[in-house]
């Protein structure tokens, strides 16, 4: 069983006003109030949110690379890498497909678009042309080829997580294969992990500012009132996503011996950060640290979390089928069982090809509708105004899906320390990771 050294002292519990989740809550509330009462002024704070997300993306590649390389190089059997990857992909495929089916079922039961009687010819197709154009770039072959970087260092100057993952896995395997000759390199990378983790901690201190700027801009630009016309669709999506996390992921968590609600409480600071920035990537480095600290194997965390950010998008999948059927209902487009099965199959593929794409949910929806001509792509103009408000829910659901997946795959691999997991989920102070302890000493 994987065990993280526990010689480091447990961190003392901080006063509530110094804890990240409290600071982010205050920032979000302040952003909402400013956006509602001073919308024009609030829009000027957009650079705060953009800057914070850029800062986090700056550190994502080093965190992923160091975590994966040191994890794989420390494995005694390289066959373990392939086994972890296959188990993770099997999990991702099953639950991503289940999320698509859930979105489709809810759309049939709730009928959010029924009675709107929209004529597609009356819609402003120009509003969605940009998204449709980007969707044509999402092909399965192009997606696969894009995983392979042009040079060994190019992934570190781009924003494609899968390229970093690809290089890290290959380098980690190579380092493990050279044995003792690679020890100096491995020791150097393990030492380098300490300042990188320290930098993550420094950047996270700016999270409240980022959340404030992002939410103030969103409310200021789009307004709370913009939700009213399509509140039924938005409400259906939020409730469905909540039920998916609590019921579906909750059932899986219970089978594996933990509570998804306790896991959400443990990750509350990261969830609030995702809510404020509308980007699950903003919490990726912190998620990797926390899952390892909670007893998940380092090698499992290094493989499952970054891969899940591209292949395990439960929230995006629920959104895609729910939104597609909403458009069909709103435009009185009749879909046969064959049409819906085709929609499901296309969505299974297109949802995997949007890693690192801005507005991924909307773009993958355009890609799906472009291949299933029965549903008018122009109908996307109906949800363009409220898509931004559904983005937060997509990101939150995606985030929780990846957190649960990490624990589940760790359990399958017997790389889960239940004593650490239970302590973390019960709110007890947890042992610092070796790299974190070294960073504190530094």
UniProtKB/Swiss-Prot annotation:
GO terms for cellular component: plasma membrane. It is a multi-pass membrane protein. GO terms for biological process: L-aspartate transmembrane transport. The chain crosses the membrane at residues 19-39, 55-75, 90-110, 161-181, 199-219, 232-252, 318-338, 366-386. Pfam families: SDF (PF00375). It is found in: Cell inner membrane. Its main location: membrane. GO terms for molecular function: fumarate transmembrane transporter activity; malate:proton symporter activity; succinate transmembrane transporter activity. PROSITE patterns: NA_DICARBOXYL_SYMP_1, NA_DICARBOXYL_SYMP_2. Keywords: Cell inner membrane, Cell membrane, Membrane, Symport, Transmembrane, Transmembrane helix, Transport. Belongs to the dicarboxylate/amino acid:cation symporter (DAACS) (TC 2.A.23) family. NCBIfam families: PRK01663.1 (NF002461), PRK13027.1 (NF009587). Responsible for the transport of dicarboxylates such as succinate, fumarate, and malate from the periplasm across the membrane. This is C4-dicarboxylate transport protein.
